[in-house]
Amino acid sequence: MGSTSRVRGTGVNRHLLSTEDLDRDDALLVLDTAERMARVAEASVRKLPTLRGRTVVNLFFEDSTRTRTSFEVAAKRLSADVINFSARGSSVSKGESLKDTAQTLEAMGADAVVCRHAASGAPHRLASWVRGSVVNAGDGTHEHPTQALLDAFTMRRRLGRIDGLAVTIVGDVLHSRVARSNVWLLATLGATVTVVAPPTLVPLGISSWPVEVSYNLDAVLPKSDVVMMLRVQRERMSAAFFPTEREYSRRYGLDADRAEMLPDHALVMHPGPMVRGMEIASRVADSARSTVVEQVANGVSVRMAVLYLLLGGSGEVS
């Protein structure tokens, strides 16, 4: 893995841009550190002084209350100063370029920049312009590495392992940065990944991914330890990718009857936000096998771990 993407180390350029850049040791280090951070969240005083005096900037060019808030809580629990920078109403909306914004962040002395952008590759460009660490919080349809890390963390907490698990990812794989990040991370950690989607929502280059492809959800569910449902991203679509929402739900939605096909131990996951009644039924989303609420809580622990490791937090976390 290149030094510019390393989660661990002592170099100046330490970024988390893609799960494809993480080796097994890197990924396990994040998950193990997140486990310790989760214990902090369960303590009476849920704060550590490890990043006191550091500045974390949340630079969001796309709306995402859930992810931005998760990073903000994570940074504040580590005692970092947090600046929330929204593109709406800012200099960016008046024509300021990403490079201009990077120079502004440099002048502010940002130690870490958490970047979400509609353009794939934007965080990578930003990482070449700033001296602080850059965390990719989602770039276009490319990647969302901390979502994949929190998903893996959730699987390991519930099932005790990731190695050897059969994970099925269902839905709009074509437009899903969550799917891409999960595929690379889970393969690195030893899981077998199958994607299930309409042919129109399967990426052209998927033959180079470490996955199996199926178009038959019913055939795959009985063999799945984890099924991850993806939201259909209408905002990223410019053409008709499936006939109707009803047809999509009938073939690729996880309703109560389909959930019965899963093994007793199997988990149902969703990165959120959910479209209830389309890709997942409310009864399934709210069932005991669903991890949707846990994923939100685990997201804070994982993002604490990432910031702690990237910024070389002071002191041990017990």
From Swiss-Prot:
Naturally occurring in which organism (per UniProt) = Frankia casuarinae (strain DSM 45818 / CECT 9043 / HFP020203 / CcI3)
Q: Where does carbamoyl phosphate bind?
A: R66, T67, R116, H144, Q147, G272, P273
Spell out the Pfam families in the cross-references. OTCace, OTCace_N
Q: Give the pathway.
A: Pyrimidine metabolism; UMP biosynthesis via de novo pathway; (S)-dihydroorotate from bicarbonate: step 2/3
Stated family = Belongs to the aspartate/ornithine carbamoyltransferase superfamily. ATCase family.
EC number, UniProt record: 2.1.3.2
Keyword list, A-Z: Pyrimidine biosynthesis, Transferase
Summarize where L-aspartate binds, as residue positions: K94, R177, R231
Gene3D superfamilies associated with the record: Aspartate/ornithine carbamoyltransferase
Subunit composition and interactions: Heterododecamer (2C3:3R2) of six catalytic PyrB chains organized as two trimers (C3), and six regulatory PyrI chains organized as three dimers (R2).
- Name the PANTHER family for this protein: ASPARTATE CARBAMOYLTRANSFERASE (PTHR45753:SF6), ORNITHINE CARBAMOYLTRANSFERASE, MITOCHONDRIAL (PTHR45753)
The UniProt function text for this chain reads: Catalyzes the condensation of carbamoyl phosphate and aspartate to form carbamoyl aspartate and inorganic phosphate, the committed step in the de novo pyrimidine nucleotide biosynthesis pathway.
Q: What is this protein called?
A: Aspartate carbamoyltransferase catalytic subunit
Catalytic reaction equation(s):
carbamoyl phosphate + L-aspartate = N-carbamoyl-L-aspartate + phosphate + H(+)
Per the record, its GO cellular-component terms are: cytosol
User: What lineage, starting at the top, does this entry show?
Assistant: Bacteria, Bacillati, Actinomycetota, Actinomycetes, Frankiales
BP term (GO), one: amino acid metabolic process
Write out the GO MF terms. amino acid binding; aspartate carbamoyltransferase activity
Source organism, top-level taxon:
Bacteria
